[in-house]
Amino acid sequence: MYKKYYSRFLEASDFLHFAAHSHHYWPDVTREATLEAWDHAATTTDLKWKKIMSEVFPKTQRHIAKLINFSRPEDIALAPNTHDLVFRLLSCFFEQDKVKVLSTDSEFYSFARQIKRLKEWDKFQVEQVKVDDSFIENFVSKLESNKYDVVFLSQVFFNSGKVISNEDMDKIIQAAGNATICLDGYHSFAAVPVDISKWEDKIFFTSGSYKYAQGGEGVCFMTLPKDCQLRPLTTVGLQSLVT
């Protein structure tokens, strides 16, 4: 039924590819889109941005917003990868004397490597809670007994498939107080039902098209809480990413 959408990958291989988690086959439309982007640049050069900013970006934002039930498509920042977006968010705190971060021991490699490096900087104090059967209880307890600047966790953990339920997310948000919360949806987006409408003004939600969304590489996003005032050192402001 779906093979016709994946003809390029299927023609290029002579084996069955099972990829519940790893590199998926991409549908033919992703190749067509890549070639269309190249051809558009060739025919318009500097003028290419007019179509990209006025048509392509808004259409992409609206589609993402629909998939995650986010009411403000215009407040979805786009970037080639989630590391870019997350690092910009973290950079909002670089001017503080100390930055307290609460996360887990099961984040995906890009964040895990980055936070490990930042821990070498005396400015960053990072606590990582083990993801086990008592995770939610332990994570909420940490939040209730400490004050953090940043809270980062996955909605679905890549190494176990454990899912943070909406009820558990409610508990985390309530216990986090004024902390900046970033929910990594890279392994939930387009894989399980995602509805962030209840928290859209309380969290940053980031994900991308590479895996389950079947959009190929280079299209990632982050939702911004309403009236976000954070100012990354790597740009003039998070809001500028969506204008």
Locate the predicted segments by residue.
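Pyridoxal 5′-phosphate
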Residues: 1-243
